[in-house]
């Protein structure tokens, strides 16, 4: 199952995606800013993590949860007996969260061939740890042949894998950007499951490296682009 969305945690029923395609951007009465935003992103959406009273205990739970999935669920679902490579491979995937998939390169970091790496990514996808998203293109066939992007689903789990914590973010926000993008992607993914409309999540990147983090497409082919920025303010170039 997917983690909780922020709207579920805060008990707000409105769906952001439905509203955006209807031309209405939802207003937030008390937007999360500064350390409050960082705290939400690092916490993620799993009820068990949210219930922990401290960041240290949330991180400990996240690591135990990941270990349990690898040791129990992966063995049962995928029939993979040699599990020793999976924790290292998952951490390698965490380092490339939000980037395009190159299975040969990813697998090579932990001694796996490209075919095995792709299979393991598929297993993690079944476990709702991450998701591969296609690139958006006007020609639908191009979506098949172009490289997918790898996104983790829960920002709290990603932060635990990367050892990103509040103290680091307060001093240096460099690595927080990828965790924030994961948070935004995860929220949009959850909203697609509760929306009235039918939506696809993709990303955009052209030959000039112009990119959009998330492209939402409805059944009519209409688009909404979403870009996540960790900076305190937006610039015209963004």
Question: What is each PLM-predicted segment?
Answer:
Residues 1-95, 99:
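Interdomain motor-coupling "hinge/lid" segment immediately C-terminal to the ATP-binding subdomain
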Residues 57, 61, 81-84, 119, ...:
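A generic structural signal for residues located within well-ordered alpha-helices
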Residues 111-126:
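Short amphipathic alpha-helical interaction segments
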Residues 122-238:
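A cross-kingdom feature that marks ATP-driven nucleic-acid transaction machinery
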């Amino acid at each position: 199952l997917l983690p909780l969305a922020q709207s579920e945690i805060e008990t707000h029923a409105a769906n952001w995606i439905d509203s955006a395609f209807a031309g209405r951007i939802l207003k937030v009465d008390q937007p999360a800013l500064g350390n409050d935003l960082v705290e939400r992103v690092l916490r993620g959406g799993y009820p068990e993590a949210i219930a922990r009273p401290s960041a240290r205990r949330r991180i400990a739970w996240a690591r135990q949860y990941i270990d349990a999935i690898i040791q129990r669920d992966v063995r049962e679902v995928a029939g993979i007996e040699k599990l020793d490579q999976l924790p290292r491979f998952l951490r390698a995937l965490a380092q490339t969260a939000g980037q395009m998939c190159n299975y040969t390169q990813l697998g090579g970091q932990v001694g796996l061939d490209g075919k095995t790496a792709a299979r393991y990514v598929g297993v993690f996808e079944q476990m709702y740890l991450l998701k591969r998203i296609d690139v958006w293109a006007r020609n639908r066939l191009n979506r098949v042949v172009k490289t997918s992007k790898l996104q983790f689903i829960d920002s709290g789990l990603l932060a635990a894998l990367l050892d990103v914590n509040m103290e680091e973010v307060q001093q240096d926000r460099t690595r927080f950007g990828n965790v924030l993008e994961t948070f935004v992607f995860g929220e949009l993914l959850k909203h697609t499951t509760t929306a009235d409309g039918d939506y696809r999540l993709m990303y955009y990147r052209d030959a000039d490296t112009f990119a959009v983090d998330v492209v939402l497409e409805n059944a009519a082919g209409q688009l909404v682009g979403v870009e996540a920025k960790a900076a305190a303010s937006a610039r015209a170039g963004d």
